Amino acid sequence: MAAAALEPWSAVAPRRRKRAAGRRPRPGEGPRAEPEADGEAVLRRLREAEEDLRISDFCSSALETITECLRKQLEQLQPLTEALGRLHLGSSLPSASQEPLASSASHVKCVCYGLGTFASCPTARIQLAFMLLFLEKCQVPRSHCWVYDPLFSQTEVSVLTSLGVTVLSENEEGKRSVQGQPTVFYMPHCGTALYNNLLWSNWSADALSRVLIIGNSFRGLEERLLARILQENYPYIAKVSDRIAGPGF
């Protein structure tokens, strides 16, 4: 299993700033979230966020890191694929060095949890734009991408559908099995329980070898939580935190 930690991003949920002494909020004033716009306006803002990310050094570096993680994962899986191919087909398959990432990535799935309300939250919109750029960079078809957030509005569901990704209708609570397919789980700042559920659902050497997580640092979770709490409430994270392979950015 590989993981890339998105430490620089803040949580999607807007935080309240401390008000200056004696200052009263103006009528209608709230968190930094924007009023939700119509679908066309949301798409326009999303395209603007994509363009901003394209010229960002952070985005470029992060995409290169993720691409390299995915390439290494697919290369490690290739010997098993070759062995199975020989068993069933009686002939060898192209080696990892012969097969480009784009060809291998066409078999990769992407599952996104916890994106946030991107129609009104700029941070969530940036996270969605980054996911779309990741799919483009690694040439993972959008039809191989599933997304879910319990807070999605109907406008956001319509926008995501128009982008070519599938919006899940049920809350899986992170309990999705990779079912033998390399799968990237894009989980920008999800709760610790979802990561634990994901590991539980794929708790075998074969399944974990096909999991790549873009999200919070497991080592960071380990440092922030008491060992007893981690062991009792999130045992699968505790088991892999010192064995996981993957950089932060």
Swiss-Prot record:
Start-end of Basic residues biased regions: 14-25
Start and end residues of each stretch annotated as Disordered: 1-40
Induction comment from the UniProt entry of this chain: Up-regulated by hemin and 5-aminolevulinic acid.
GO biological process: heme biosynthetic process; regulation of circadian rhythm; regulation of heme biosynthetic process; rhythmic process
InterPro entries xrefs: SRR1-like, SRR1L
A single Gene Ontology CC term: cytoplasm
Keyword terms of this UniProt record: Biological rhythms, Cytoplasm, Heme biosynthesis
Biased composition (Basic and acidic residues): 26-40
Chief location bin: cytoplasm
Location of the protein in the cell: Cytoplasm
Keyword Chloroplast in annotation: no
Family: Belongs to the SRR1 family.
Function, in words: Plays a role in the regulation of heme biosynthesis and in the regulation of the expression of core clock genes.
Protein name as catalogued: SRR1-like protein
Organism name: Mus musculus (Mouse)
Chain's gene name: Srrd
